[in-house]
């Protein structure tokens, strides 16, 4: 006997229900790269993403899942042996740290409570202790999908600045993109 459990629907990180109009739009045939409309659609994506992130800065689209974007950011920004800091906020921060280790990066973690956002004071103190400025990057998960914890990006940016630390702030915003009021603090 087959049990029907109601309407099937796609869940994206969050999970978030996808409206029917979006699902219907996904039923359109894929444009070929040589299609004259492809450039218009692509440019629309770039321009519209600027609105989402409230920026005039350059937008880069990367076709992969979040883990693919992690790997791309790690191998294109850092070199083997570089030191990075990954504050622990849940499964995704730990997975990103594990990937970085596999790519031969030196990973420092800032222990955290999976039920709370990053301890901003602890982050700032950790960076202040890096007097030789060896930490090349600070990797943050904006929203941990499983726990729903959302980290305060403006406060994190302020902590890095207050510590007078040059480490590059890299943010995984897969589960939060489009939900934050503004991303201007990342400039």
Residue ranges and their predicted role:
Residues 1-5:
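Basic/polar N-terminal segments that are highly enriched at the extreme N-terminus
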Residues 118-177:
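Active-site phosphate-binding strand-loop segment of PLP-dependent enzymes
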Residues 56-85, 89-97:
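Conserved beta-loop-alpha segment that forms the PLP phosphate-binding cup at the N-terminus of a helix
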Residues 10-12, 60-63, 86, 109-110, ...:
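General beta-strand structural signal in soluble alpha/beta enzymes
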Residues 7-63, 67:
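A glycine-/small-polar-enriched, mobile loop at the entrance of the PLP active site in fold-type I
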Residues 184-185:
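Conserved small/polar residues in nucleotide/adenosyl-binding loops
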Residues 111-116:
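Short beta->alpha junction loops
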Residues 95-106:
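Active-site-proximal loop->helix
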């Amino acid at each position: 006997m087959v049990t029907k459990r109601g309407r099937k629907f796609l869940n994206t990180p969050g999970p978030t229900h996808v409206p029917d109009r979006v699902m219907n739009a996904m039923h359109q045939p894929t444009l070929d790269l040589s299609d004259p409309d492809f450039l218009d659609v692509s440019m629309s994506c770039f321009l519209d993403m600027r609105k989402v992130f409230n920026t005039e800065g350059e937008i880069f689209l990367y076709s992969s899942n979040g883990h693919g974007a992690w790997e791309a950011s790690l191998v294109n920004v850092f070199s083997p042996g570089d030191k990075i800091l990954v504050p622990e906020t849940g499964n995704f921060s730990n997975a990103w740290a594990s990937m970085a280790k596999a790519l031969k990066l030196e990973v420092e973690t800032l222990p955290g409570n999976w039920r709370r956002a990053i301890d901003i004071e602890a982050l700032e103190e950790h960076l202040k202790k890096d007097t030789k400025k060896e930490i090349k990057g600070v990797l943050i998960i904006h929203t941990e999908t499983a726990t729903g914890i959302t980290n305060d990006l403006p406060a994190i940016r302020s902590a890095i600045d207050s510590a007078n630390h040059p480490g590059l702030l890299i943010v995984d915003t897969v589960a939060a993109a489009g939900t934050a009021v503004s991303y201007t603090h990342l400039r």
